[in-house]
Curated annotation (Swiss-Prot):
Keyword Secreted listed: no
Residue runs in coiled coils: none
Organism for this UniProt entry: Tremblaya princeps
Name of this chain's protein: Chaperonin GroEL
UniProt superkingdom: Bacteria
InterPro entries hit by this protein: Chaperonin_Cpn60_CS (IPR018370), Cpn60/GroEL (IPR001844), Cpn60/GroEL/TCP-1 (IPR002423), GroEL-like_apical_dom_sf (IPR027409), GROEL-like_equatorial_sf (IPR027413), TCP-1-like_intermed_sf (IPR027410)
Lineage start: Bacteria, Pseudomonadati, Pseudomonadota, Betaproteobacteria, Candidatus Tremblaya
CDD domains: GroEL
Underlying gene: groEL
Amino acid sequence: MPAKDVIFGDCARLRLMEGVNTLTDAVKVTLGPKGRNVVLERSYGSPAVTKDGVTVAKDIELRDRLQNMGAQMVKEVAAKTSDNAGDGTTTATVLAQSIVREGMRYVASGVNPMDIKRGIDQAVSSAVMELKKISRPCTTGKEIAQVGSVSANNDRTVGEMIAEAMNKVGKEGVITVEDGKSLADELEVVEGMQFDRGYLSPYFINNPDRQVAVLDSPFVLLCEKKVASIRDLLPIMERVAKAGRPLLIVAEDVEGEALATLVVNNARGILKAAAVKAPGFGDRRKAMLQDIAILTGGHVVSEETGLSLEKVSLPELGQAKRAEVAKDTTTIIDGAGDAKAINARIKHIRLQIEEAASDYDKEKLQERVAKLAGGVAVIRVGAATEVEMKEKKARVEDALHATRAAVEEGIVPGGGVALIRARNAISNLRCDNPDQDAGIRIVLRAMEEPLRQIVANGGEEASVVASSVASGKSISYGYNAAMRVYGDLMDAGVVDPTKVTRSALQNAASVAGLMLTTDVAVCDSPKREEAAPTQPVHGGVG
């Protein structure tokens, strides 16, 4: 086991504080509309340029181990805020630095750190309640576009594109961000349920221009096992052909004479059909087949349900307004499923999301919700160079997270003003003893810091602006750093999601409180480099 260094008291706290300052000073230059970029070295390829606080924080590792421990604790603030709200990482880092810095002064002067932490917790709890009072719902496309624009560094195009995507796929729909192939940003919306499985034979194609098989008002046969024998498939094919409608088969696989018969019947015009493999694998395949069944109002043919292919009747098949089968994707549009059953299925999947342990499982479950609820929108980010594309893509992803947070918990005035208003509302808060009151004062001072940093990054005098904003009568009165004017920030479209501001304050206070109550730090001793062996010195020959 390697030797350890044990550092006590003020010496430990000061070294931790140095690490906090180093990381925060690198991150906080990105805050606000006038914030600067940070260039990050990469072991291969061109360097990354970013204005995203958590990306900068994650890239920083300090040589001094004790300082690095302090930096890693603040990095946790940024990462936790990013996970919870998707944005506000720089604000959280700035708040954490201020709480730690002010708190260290009180601890050094003999104030009880445990009481300071209790005071901090009380102040944060009261401030969060005030933020919720200030908050207002974010419902209109204009408000969603404003949130997206502010988060994307005042890029209106991004905000409007996200608002349009949300309008088309709904607030529950999935919106993904991908690299574009042109200079312009593009939005593509896939309506209905789409999964990544295509036709099993190109002979199903009936639209040569688009290279797809289009089925209007099809019946949908869902089967959990392989379909190889024509005897299994023939009865249902005859029933569908009599009904004069197309047939879409979604099964584990369709092969041999079953596939050949489908192709021949399709080519002769006897039965318009297409066959695709079921999406997913194992239990996920079963779940997705059930999703399609509920969406289309059909049943899954499986041994578990006791339903066999020979006995399937038309009422047990799913139905849809339209189906499009391409080489790699299948889209089912406007399924005939019962709305109550679909909503119940969505509710059931949401419960699974809450219980899911891994991010991968949560992502896949969220995709299933989106496919049932509305659709999928893809934003393709365009740029002239790869470096610019990476930076822009990160901004668009931040903006997307921010708009989701705004829809969830509402919006507050941006530019650090919401924290100033919450601060004014709790300025007379008192606790059980003077040491706890010191914790309240620390939080009150920290809540000014994001506004001060935004103003400082814009090249203005922070104290003058902070004083003017604090004395404003209206809740949404503040300083618009992008335009360098005072006014109503809500009207100007300078807004932040309530969830982002709340998460930033809570996470910053949580980690800062732990650092203030730390009295001993234990870390690995630096390895001493072994001296290089020296060659023996030989005397000269006389």
